[in-house]
Design a protein with these regions (language model features):
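A common structural junction motif
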Residues: 153-162, 255-263, 366-375, 466-468, ...
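M16 family metallopeptidases and their MPP-like homologs
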Residues: 66, 71-97, 110-157, 175, ...
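Hydrophobic helical h-region of N-terminal Sec-dependent signal peptides
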Residues: 9-13, 17
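Short proline/glycine- and acidic-rich turn/helix-capping motifs at secondary-structure junctions
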Residues: 171, 268-277, 379-389
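Histidine-acidic residue clusters that define the catalytic metal-binding segment
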Residues: 34-53, 196-235, 267-271, 392, ...
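Bacterial N-terminal signal peptides that target proteins for export
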Residues: 1-9
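His/Glu-rich zincin catalytic helix
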Residues: 22-116, 120, 223-326, 447-481
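Short, polar/flexible loop-turn hinges at active-site or ligand-entry regions and domain interfaces
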Residues: 104-107, 157-165
Length: 481
């Protein structure tokens, strides 16, 4: 089990869990596999036509299933609308509840749970975001291994002890995450930018809560939140692997029946009054400046989402060519859409030299204004579509990749087709992309953050002038010139 590794993934802080519940902000080395047959072989990807089956239990649990009989194994992922943005008035409650889930069930503590899964050749993983939490199980399909693994998995989900004795440890670990978050320039720039877009909203809070909020949380609050947010009506189950349709239905019903009875939680409300466009400067000692620009966008199930996503791929390529390749001002720049469920978000982020942060910000705004006015070129669109068509089979090469896509389809109410977004993107034309861009974005609506040292500003170097002083990548968050 992987437990609470604090990660920043685009606009969503994701916590991955390990059995010891030990926090880290960097990816840890892969563990030695407990069972070789659970490792999917690295074979060249080929396109697979995969049929999605959908069901719903009487208690309201949504189930999606894809059969992949190539390997004698399966993956189950259970997701709840129980992320940090669901508890804005009790900061940290979602993270504390999530962290206590596998601390014990009847007759087993956290170590015994881990040992049982290991002995069965199974693996449990967990994750949390602002919107949702998820818990997954990978197991062999053989019934003698599958049955006890699923029984324990369902017990962890539906009847965790949420022990009082583990509460101080969990709070301490989340406090550690908050400490690290405050020391991370990238995290602070992100939180500040989210605060501009989502003032007084759960999305603007740290995934881990606040110090005062964590201190105040009681076991009774945790138990109440588990009973409400981890209810069958608030659950979504995705299954992928070597199972028959009857077995998948039975597994889904088994997991759903183990959960508390209850309806779906209230949806997170979208932001109605974001802060006015503008620039927020945060002075911090650093060898670089952290830049973030954001403005409202569309939800993932919007008809325009695919076109805007393609547009941002193209614009990212333009930014990379201009800022990295021609001027040597950054190692990496990215323009991307968020996967938040209540409010879409377009974000551009990069790191650059402090003395040229203002000039870089102005240049990005000018480039985006030109992009809105002119749209992409035919060559840019064809190149992006060709790359997408070539990489699409890689997205369904393994069960885990399929599971991730299936989870996104379930969470965002997307069409029941793994190829839907790819096929829609391949049908895009210049007019549809430019129309979508100008329908949703404005050149003067950026909320921007520059975090870094105060210094005299310099103009942009001419293309090619900074080749010998270009930004370079070194370990950690350090990007030196």
């Amino acid at each position: 089990m992987d437990k609470l590794k604090g990660l920043i993934n685009g606009l969503i802080l994701v916590g991955m869990l390990s059995s010891a519940q030990s926090p880290a902000t960097a990816t840890t080395a892969p563990q030695k596999p407990v069972l070789q047959s659970l490792n999917e072989p690295q074979t060249p990807a080929t396109h697979r036509t995969l049929s999605i089956k959908g069901y719903k239990t009487l208690s309201g649990t949504k189930i999606l299933f894809i059969r992949t009989p190539g390997l004698p194994m399966f993956d189950a992922l259970v997701s709840f609308a129980a992320g940090s943005a669901h508890t804005p008035h009790n900061p940290g409650l979602a993270a504390v509840t999530y962290s206590l889930l596998n601390e014990g069930v009847a007759g087993k503590d956290v170590n015994a749970i881990q040992a049982t899964f290991d002995n069965l050749g199974a693996r449990m993983d967990m994750g949390i975001s602002q919107d949702r939490i998820w818990i997954s199980l990978r197991s062999l399909s053989d019934e003698s291994r599958r049955t006890p693994a699923l029984e324990l998995f369902a017990q962890v989900l539906g009847k965790p002890l949420l022990p009082q004795e583990s509460l101080p440890t969990v709070k301490s670990q989340l406090q550690y995450f908050l400490d690290h978050e405050e020391q991370s320039h990238a995290a602070q720039a992100q939180i500040a930018n989210l605060g501009q877009l989502f003032p007084d909203h759960g999305y603007a809070q740290s995934l881990y809560g606040t110090r005062a909020g964590l201190t105040a949380i009681t076991r009774t609050q945790v138990q109440d939140f588990h009973r409400e947010a981890y209810a069958a009506g608030n659950a979504q189950i995705t299954l992928v692997g070597d199972l028959t349709e009857e077995e998948a239905q039975r597994i889904g019903a088994q997991i759903s029946a183990a959960l508390p009875l209850g309806p779906a939680t209230a949806a997170i409300q979208p932001v109605t009054s974001p802060a006015a466009p503008g620039l927020l400067r945060i002075e911090r000692p650093s060898t670089q400046a952290y830049l973030r620009l954001a403005q409202p966008s569309v939800l993932q199930n919007s008809p325009d989402y695919v076109g805007l996503q393609m547009a941002m791929r193209i614009f990212t390529n333009r930014l990379t060519h201009e800022l990295r390749e021609r001027r040597g001002l950054t190692y990496h720049v990215d323009a991307d859409l968020s996967a938040l469920q209540a409010q879409g978000l377009l974000t551009i982020k990069l790191q650059t030299r402090p003395e040229q942060a203002d000039a870089v910000l102005a240049h990005i705004k000018t480039m985006f204004s030109d992009f809105l006015a002119q749209g992409p070129t035919q060559q840019e669109l064809e190149d992006s579509q060709q790359r997408l068509a070539g990489s699409a089979p890689l997205n369904s090469a393994t069960n885990m990749q399929i599971l991730r896509q299936l989870h996104a389809i379930s969470a965002h109410n997307l069409p029941l087709d793994l190829d839907f977004a790819t096929q829609a993107a391949l049908k895009l034309n210049l007019i549809s992309i430019k129309t979508a861009l100008n329908r949703h974005y404005h050149a003067d609506q950026w909320r921007a953050v520059i975090l870094g040292p105060k210094t005299d500003q310099q103009p942009l170097p001419a293309p090619g002038e900074s080749a010998t002083n270009a930004m370079c990548r070194v370990p950690g968050e350090i990007v030196a010139s």
